[in-house]
Amino acid sequence: MVRGRISRLSVRDVRFPTSLGGHGADAMHTDPDYSAAYVVIETDAEDGIKGCGITFTLGKGTEVVVCAVNALAHHVLNKDLKDIVGDFRGFYRQLTSDGQLRWIGPEKGVVHLATAAVLNAVWDLWAKQEGKPVWKLLVDMDPRMLVSCIDFRYITDVLTEEDALEILQKGQIGKKEREKQMLAQGYPAYTTSCAWLGYSDDTLKQLCAQALKDGWTRFKVKVGADLQDDMRRCQIIRDMIGPEKTLMMDANQRWDVPEAVEWMSKLAKFKPLWIEEPTSPDDILGHATISKALVPLGIGIATGEQCHNRVIFKQLLQAKALQFLQIDSCRLGSVNENLSVLLMAKKFEIPVCPHAGGVGLCELVQHLIIFDYISVSASLENRVCEYVDHLHEHFKYPVMIQRASYMPPKDPGYSTEMKEESVKKHQYPDGEVWKKLLPAQEN
């Protein structure tokens, strides 16, 4: 039962020094320190339940997101949770349409990352109070209630409330069977853990061999910095995994449009399923041009992890600019905005293959993609969710992978709650880890 008035909101800057091991390095982000703005909301319900939310960053700039969260806090404090979820669309619009803050958005950039962190905490709180994981909260929700959580502004030319309701009502058919299937088998995943650009060939081989031993059949490799290096590394991985297993590539926005086509034409020999983020995430027509050139080579376009909002996704779908749509649980406006994108993808029959990894992204997005299969897409064809084996030990309810699949979480909430000792240790700049590292970095 939903209860309580939100009485406190706190936010902390939490950073993990992943750059020291080359973890997460790609063609554009060469030395990331995986980080998060970590939000905790409390109520006056005196039940001890807290809502925890995060948004993912790469180190520097996390303090800016923290500042934006604090700027949004007045929209949340002293609100009854019952009133928020009773008019979630209205609350979402209140957060995203602040008459002054929207000028540094609107619905994009730092202020939208902050919005995601706050809303993720609200969803975590709601699900915990209901005693359900978020995916189950969504699956059990009446289609009309789900629709009421979505802001359809700017997308009604593609998806109306009536369209969304029709999709969700159709999704009720066979829902119980699909839920049983997920609980038994899990949602298929692929691994990005073995092929970061910061890794040596020996490390790549070692991690790839271990992934094969662990049962992984789908692998992603980072490309885009140096063509000859890409050719060598892709050859290593393809030789190790064999011709039957799936290989994906990710350029992390490195190329201009003609360069993307030329580069991928040379990497086509390694038979990638897709090239991810081949160019600027804002260049819808550029993606469409690349798609038109590469689809005849059997290479699809995947993008979305840095798409600002539902409008960019709408245009990518309209322009036939992608074959695989990658939602992000912290880039878009939390569950609310992701619902609209899942529904648009269903309408266009484009498979959703979420971006994950980072700090807590796997923990969050598993809820969305499991809900998508059970209640929206009803298909696993060409669908797979990213998995990166980093930093899960810092979460109270970490993801569970079995047989290279995400097993549906059973603990109440959004799986966003971090261990307090981890937060204190990695808080920037005064946590134990950074008190040791910062003086050394300055010398």
Swiss-Prot record:
Top EC class of this enzyme: lyase
Location in or out of the cell: Mitochondrion
Name of the protein in question: Mitochondrial enolase superfamily member 1
Cofactor(s) needed for function: Mg(2+)
Database matches in Pfam families: MR_MLE_C, MR_MLE_N
Cofactor stoichiometry and binding remark: Binds 1 Mg(2+) ion per subunit.
Gene encoding the protein: ENOSF1
Residues with Phosphoserine modification: S148
GO molecular function: hydro-lyase activity; isomerase activity; L-fuconate dehydratase activity; magnesium ion binding
Binding residue positions for substrate: G24, A25, D26, Y34, K220, N252, E276, E305, H355, A356, G357, E386
EC number: 4.2.1.68
InterPro entries per record: Enolase-like_C_sf (IPR036849), Enolase-like_N (IPR029017), Enolase_C-like (IPR029065), L-fuconate_dehydratase (IPR034610), Mandel_Rmase/mucon_lact_enz_CS (IPR018110), Mandelate_racemase_C (IPR013342), Mandelate_racemase_N_dom (IPR013341), RHMD-like (IPR046945)
Active site, UniProt feature: K222, H355
Keywords: Dyskeratosis congenita, Isomerase, Lyase, Magnesium, Metal-binding, Mitochondrion, Phosphoprotein, Ubl conjugation
Record's keyword annotation contains Lyase: yes
Principal location: mitochondrion
Phylogenetic lineage: Eukaryota, Metazoa, Chordata, Craniata, Vertebrata
UniProt xrefs under PANTHER family: ENOLASE SUPERFAMILY, MANDELATE RACEMASE, MITOCHONDRIAL ENOLASE SUPERFAMILY MEMBER 1
GO cellular component entries: mitochondrion
